[in-house]
């Protein structure tokens, strides 16, 4: 048992490192993705901050949506990780990985960790741009560590979802279509840019079962307050969801090549 756990951790690290090397050799994707949160904060956030029609729990609107835009950036990176699996299959890399003794869960965790690292780079972009806009954030060692943890867990959740989708649809075209369809509904059916309390009843139900909402909750507490009140439940939801996604993804992973 100990040897198995050790192998899973080691292989996950190796696979994550491989993905990180790809990012270092071709950072253009992250650069292009960094434009989106900058536009959301700089245009959408600035415009709605003048309206003052949305209750923001005592914060400015820019403060309120900064954790939401950070979450959006991480989710948009993670949700397309299934596409990389399909690309690996098309190039023959996936088939080679599947015939090795590498545990399936390690293949999944390697992708999840890689997505988390990409998500952290997006988090840095969002925080820096928010500070440039004059947004007051709680920057401390505790908050930074908490943000890293939540970003990694959130990336794991949505990478797992992405891998499950890839295992079902199996083609790039279908995956891109479904990816585009689910990302914006996930974002808007959460508390990222407005509180759940002002949503219609049915939408509140969706928001309360949407993992993205718990990611935003945790980040909002860490980034805007000096407390950690309620963050334990948010972390619990993310951890449990990430584990469930890991197990399902590991089980479905080989189906990509069938």
Regions found by a protein language model. Name each.
Residues 1-36:
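Aromatic- and glycine-rich beta-strand/loop motifs that create alpha-glucan
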Residues 22, 53-57, 187-244, 257:
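Membrane-interfacial helix-loop-helix junctions in multi-pass membrane proteins
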Residues 27, 47-57:
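Short, hydrophobic transmembrane alpha-helix segments
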Residues 31-37, 171-190:
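Pore- or pathway-lining transmembrane helices of multi-pass membrane proteins that form conduits
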Residues 39-44, 61-133, 153-154, 158, ...:
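Hydrophobic alpha-helical transmembrane segments of multi-pass membrane transport proteins
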Residues 104, 108-179, 226-250:
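Alpha-helical transmembrane segments and their short interhelical loops
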Residues 251-258:
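Short cytosolic juxtamembrane segments of multi-pass membrane proteins
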């Amino acid at each position: 048992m100990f040897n198995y756990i050790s192998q899973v951790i080691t292989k996950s690290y190796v696979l994550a490192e491989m993905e990180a090397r790809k990012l270092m050799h071709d950072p253009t994707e992250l650069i292009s993705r960094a434009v989106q949160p900058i536009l959301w904060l700089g245009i959408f956030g600035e415009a709605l901050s003048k309206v003052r029609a949305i209750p923001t729990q005592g914060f400015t609107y820019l403060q309120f949506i900064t954790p939401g835009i950070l979450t959006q950036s991480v989710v948009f990176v993670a949700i397309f990780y299934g596409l990389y699996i399909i690309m690996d299959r098309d190039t023959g890399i996936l088939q080679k990985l599947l015939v090795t003794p590498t545990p399936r869960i390690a293949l999944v965790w390697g992708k999840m960790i890689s997505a988390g690292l990409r998500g952290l780079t997006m988090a840095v972009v969002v925080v820096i741009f928010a500070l440039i806009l004059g947004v007051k954030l709680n920057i401390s060692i505790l908050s930074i560590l908490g943000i890293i943890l939540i970003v990694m867990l959130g990336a794991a959740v949505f990478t797992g979802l992405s891998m499950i989708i890839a295992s079902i649809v199996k083609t790039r075209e279908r995956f891109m279509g479904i990816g585009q369809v689910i990302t914006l509904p996930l974002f808007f059916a959460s508390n990222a840019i407005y509180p759940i309390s002002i949503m219609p009843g049915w939408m509140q139900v969706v928001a309360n079962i949407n993992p993205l909402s718990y990611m935003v909750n945790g980040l909002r507490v860490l980034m805007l307050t000096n407390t950690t009140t309620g963050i334990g439940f948010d972390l619990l939801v993310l951890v449990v969801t990430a584990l469930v996604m890991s197990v399902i993804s590991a089980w479905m992973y080989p189906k990509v090549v069938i």
